[in-house]
């Protein structure tokens, strides 16, 4: 997009969102952040996301205050929130839907903090986490809820599917079952990274709005290639990194998560995975996420062995998919470089089990540096 068109788009959305900012008493900083988020989504998804974005920003309040999200949530009687987060979405399912399918969801609120724990969050990190949460809400705009029967309520947000079952004996009056939670987080993390880098690329243009230009100048990255890396690069993201680099897959996810045809994504994955179904693949990713916290916390050899076993299985699936999707030894080798990071990571998990803490953490730091190196190679080779 040329300089004239970008400035026109930024100015239009900035003026459009001024009314919403006044309604919720947003600061100038937050107004600029939602303007940049709006423009990034607009450039990614086109005009079809224009009305949904405005509707979301007009109805979903962003609570941006001093402190971390847990402190802010408690101040607003939203209950305790996960530690270590910069932003979270507060959501309460509307159980009246079991009796009246025309009911709407309760309004959501996005909580954005200035700190991660006790540490000050950088401008780039705050923008990333705000876009991450807004994208979750946007991907659920056309897929908010479906009352299947009087006892079953289905809700989808992106690739995250949840079934709520009416249970009058339970304290919350319902039970739930989810699928695709981790896969949704992985794709959301990666696409959010692309959006943040899109915004940071605006530095190459002459931005006429002084407030927006000054804010964009505060967005920094320590990466050698000057590209911002999302904070969510944990084990499951590294495992799927070769798949995330596949433009056909990412474009399909980006469009289908928004427009609602999740079956196209399921078919794409199942057509390229011979040995497992889509649901089984999603369940393994969820297990990796759950077990990664368990083995470090509980020092349980069984948890670690299961963790490594599932990682090896998923690694095999990704190799299988690469052979089908890429069909080129050059590309397969390129993406294997990224995949090998996860293999090194799992091999060195045993340092923890043997109590060699120093060696364990040195290994993790080495793997992180290796990941950055390979990510740079991938970018240079494209």
Q: What would you call each of these model-derived segments?
A:
Residues 5-6, 209-382:
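Pan-zinc metallopeptidase signature
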Residues 51-55, 146-159, 202-217:
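Short, glycine/acidic-rich hinge or "gate" loops at secondary-structure transitions
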Residues 12-65, 71-73, 77-89, 134:
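Zn2+-dependent metallopeptidase catalytic core
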Residues 30-33, 37, 117-126, 175-187, ...:
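Conserved aromatic-histidine-acidic binding/catalytic patches
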Residues 124, 140-186:
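Post-HEXXH active-site segment of zinc metalloproteases
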Residues 66-147, 158:
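Active-site scaffold of zinc-dependent metalloenzymes
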Residues 135-143, 191-201, 244-245:
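Hydrophobic/aromatic-lined pockets within catalytic cores
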Residues 165-238:
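Metalloprotease/metallohydrolase-associated module, dominated by Zn2+-dependent proteases
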């Amino acid at each position: 997009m040329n300089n004239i068109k970008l400035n026109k788009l930024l100015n239009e959305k900035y003026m459009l969102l001024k009314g919403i900012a006044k309604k919720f008493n947003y600061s100038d900083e937050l107004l600029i952040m939602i303007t940049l988020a709006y423009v990034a989504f607009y450039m990614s998804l086109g005009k079809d996301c224009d009305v949904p974005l405005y509707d979301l920003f007009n109805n979903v309040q962003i609570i941006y205050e001093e402190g971390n999200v847990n402190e802010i949530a408690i101040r607003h009687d939203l209950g305790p929130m996960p530690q270590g987060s910069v932003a979270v979405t507060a959501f309460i399912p509307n159980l009246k839907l079991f009796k009246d399918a025309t009911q709407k969801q309760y309004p959501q609120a996005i909580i954005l903090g200035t700190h991660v724990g006790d540490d000050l969050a950088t401008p780039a990190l705050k923008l990333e986490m705000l876009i991450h949460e807004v994208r979750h809400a946007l991907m659920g705009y056309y897929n908010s809820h479906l009352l299947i029967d009087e006892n079953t309520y289905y809700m989808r947000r992106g690739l995250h599917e949840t079934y709520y079952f009416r249970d009058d004996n339970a304290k919350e009056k319902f039970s739930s079952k989810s699928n695709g939670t981790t896969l949704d987080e992985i794709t959301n993390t990666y696409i959010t990274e692309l959006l943040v880098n899109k915004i940071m690329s605006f530095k190459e243009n002459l931005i006429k709005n002084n407030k927006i230009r000054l804010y964009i100048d505060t967005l920094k990255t320590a990466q050698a290639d000057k590209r911002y890396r999302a904070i969510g690069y944990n084990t499951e993201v590294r495992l799927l990194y070769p798949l995330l680099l596949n433009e056909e897959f990412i474009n399909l996810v980006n469009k289908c998560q928004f427009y609602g045809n999740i079956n196209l994504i399921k078919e794409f994955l199942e057509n390229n995975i011979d040995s497992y179904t889509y649901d089984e693949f999603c369940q393994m990713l969820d297990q990796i996420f759950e077990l990664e916290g368990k083995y470090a916390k509980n020092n349980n050899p069984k948890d670690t062995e299961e963790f490594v076993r599932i990682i090896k299985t998923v690694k095999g699936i990704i190799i299988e998919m690469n052979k089908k999707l890429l069909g080129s030894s050059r590309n397969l080798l390129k993406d294997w470089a990224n995949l090998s990071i996860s293999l090194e990571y799992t091999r060195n998990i045993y340092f923890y089990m043997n109590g060699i803490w120093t060696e364990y953490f040195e290994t993790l730091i080495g793997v992180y540096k290796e990941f950055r190196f390979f990510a740079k190679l991938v970018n240079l080779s494209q």
